[in-house]
Amino acid sequence: MAIRKLNPTTNGTRNMSILDYKTNLTGHAPEKSLMKILKKNSGRNNRGVITTRHKGGREKRFYRLVDFKRNKDNIEAIVKTIEYDPNRSANISLVTYLDGEKRYILSPKGIKVGQRIVSGENVDIIVGNSLELANIPEGTNIHNIELQPKGGGILARSAGSYAQILGKEESGKYVLIRLKSGEVRKVFAKCRATIGIVGNEEHSLVNIGKAGRNRHKGIRPTVRGSVMNPIDHPHGGGEGKQPIGRKAPLTPWGKKALGVKTRDNKKSSTKLIIRRRKESK
């Protein structure tokens, strides 16, 4: 999908860029039977307490029911549309099975309207088809990867993401995959994945341009802790502009920030990770 840069007619549009949806999307109205109302939570829990900061005030959305399991086996489906989904960075495609059922799936890169796709154990290695990892050859790019058999896709679902199959264990229980982050891990061979790369890979190259676009998405401003009062943040207080007064930066709740590992050491899936993801610089 192409990126269109706007003319600098105002300060807000000076560096703004947008995705040119007309070049890729079909422009159809979403399927009403696969939509439901999405309630706004504004980062609050059931008690009204803020659990996620910097959220609130977004546009109304309807949630699209996307099929991450791809469990309708050996029945061909025809791709009818490629649509925008406000709830994720990737686009979605409406597919109609030969028995009449309609479902939304993640739209892979290169998929076209009218293309036929299918799920099953021994289907062809074609973009959009879904099958078990044990039946996918090494070196194939995949997305929408399950972590538990029949549990639905968990990994590689955002725009432009994918994983690559590196090899298979002799026992046949696990398949080795490399994620886009550089992490290498084992996944059960009975888990399913979809062939191809998730589309709309230019999503990360868009320049927001002005604060109002983030407010439409429900992203509120982020305030520095050093300009707060001491009661609000460990970095707060002092006369005028002051250093944080600590050996290392802290979170608003007093825990160390920047460089602290947050993964639970007792997590059972840690033993399946062969190589950790690349450290950010």
UniProtKB/Swiss-Prot annotation:
GO CC, sorted alphabetically, is:
large ribosomal subunit
Concerning SUPFAM superfamilies, the annotation shows:
Nucleic acid-binding proteins, Translation proteins SH3-like domain
Recorded coiled-coil stretches: none
Q: Name one Pfam family in it.
A: Ribosomal_L2_C
* Gene3D superfamilies the UniProt entry points to: 2.30.30.30, Nucleic acid-binding proteins, Ribosomal protein L2, domain 3
Q: Name one GO molecular function term.
A: rRNA binding
> Per the record, which residues fall in region Disordered?
213-281
Task: Please provide the Gene Ontology terms (biological process) for this protein.
Answer: cytoplasmic translation
Q: Where are the transmembrane segments?
A: none
Query: What keywords would UniProt list here?
Result: Ribonucleoprotein, Ribosomal protein, RNA-binding, rRNA-binding
Determine the domain of life of the protein's source: Bacteria
Name the job this protein performs.
One of the primary rRNA binding proteins. Required for association of the 30S and 50S subunits to form the 70S ribosome, for tRNA binding and peptide bond formation. It has been suggested to have peptidyltransferase activity; this is somewhat controversial. Makes several contacts with the 16S rRNA in the 70S ribosome.
Similarity comment: family membership: Belongs to the universal ribosomal protein uL2 family.
Kindly give the PANTHER family that the UniProt entry links to this protein. Answer: LARGE RIBOSOMAL SUBUNIT PROTEIN UL2M, RIBOSOMAL PROTEIN L2
How it assembles, according to the record, is: Part of the 50S ribosomal subunit. Forms a bridge to the 30S subunit in the 70S ribosome.
Q: Which HAMAP family match?
A: Ribosomal_uL2_B
Query: NCBIfam families per the record?
Result: rplB_bact
What is the name listed in the Swiss-Prot or TrEMBL entry for this protein?
Large ribosomal subunit protein uL2
Native source species: Mycoplasmopsis pulmonis (strain UAB CTIP)
